[in-house]
Amino acid sequence: MKMRLHFVVDPMGWFCMSMVFFVWIYNSFLIPKLVLLPHYAEGHITAEPVICYYLASLLCFSALFRASTTDPGKLAQDPKIPLAERDNWELCNKCNMMRPKRSHHCSRCGHCVRRMDHHCPWINNCVGEDNHWLFLQLCFYTQVLSFYTLVLDFCQYYYFLPLSSVDQADFAVHHELALLRVSCFMGLIMFGGISSLFYTQVKGILTDTTTIEKMSHLTEEVPRRPWQQAMAEVFGTRWKVLWFLPFRSRHPLKLNLTIRSHV
């Protein structure tokens, strides 16, 4: 699958996504400036914590960018349906297009999405078959970055040695306490909310149930698959190390096809 940029024209989605971006850039700039770099310069910490924080920040932003700009599985205008699979397709009663079963018509985006999980305003995009793996990465790295930020906020006042060579006239240094309190508040909100979302997403994958199917009470009893198989289908590869890399393309990996009713 080629990496094509996909944008949704939705002012509310742009607003929600800008809030997420603000939280990311606030902590990615503030924590190194007030905590990591000054303590590294004075020899209180080694380079590893600094590198790890920047790496977590980079992976989080990469997953955010990829999840918001990757086509979630939009159906072509005139799909070519193989003869052997015609029984697994149906007509959408909103856009009058043929689509695979378990697809859903997104009223926000105005088109059908293959195996759509939900529309997420925080990434201004649908979460579907082709970008679900990126959404999972975003949730995972947001948890990592938020937790790391909370740990550093705590260490700044209760563990690290006092700094002696900082510029007290600098705005960020002068208002350090207030700025780090805001950082801590953001970290708590993000870590708590995303942890709950990540749990429900992983549970849905393991039970082969989308968020829309759960909300519509249209779930069916299906045999439980091994977790490795379920996750491999979402990420498009059996190589577990690749599950954590947003800098790649996904290729469909159908290990076990389950057909259900549509929503």
From Swiss-Prot:
Residues 26-44, 153-181 are extracellular. It is an enzyme of class 2 (transferase). The chain crosses the membrane at residues 5-25, 45-65, 132-152, 182-202. One of its GO terms (molecular function) is protein-cysteine S-palmitoyltransferase activity. Its main location: Golgi. The keyword Cell membrane applies. Its EC number is 2.3.1.225. Coiled coil: none annotated. The keyword Lipoprotein applies. One of its GO terms (cellular component) is endoplasmic reticulum. GO terms for biological process: peptidyl-L-cysteine S-palmitoylation; protein targeting to membrane. This is Palmitoyltransferase ZDHHC21.
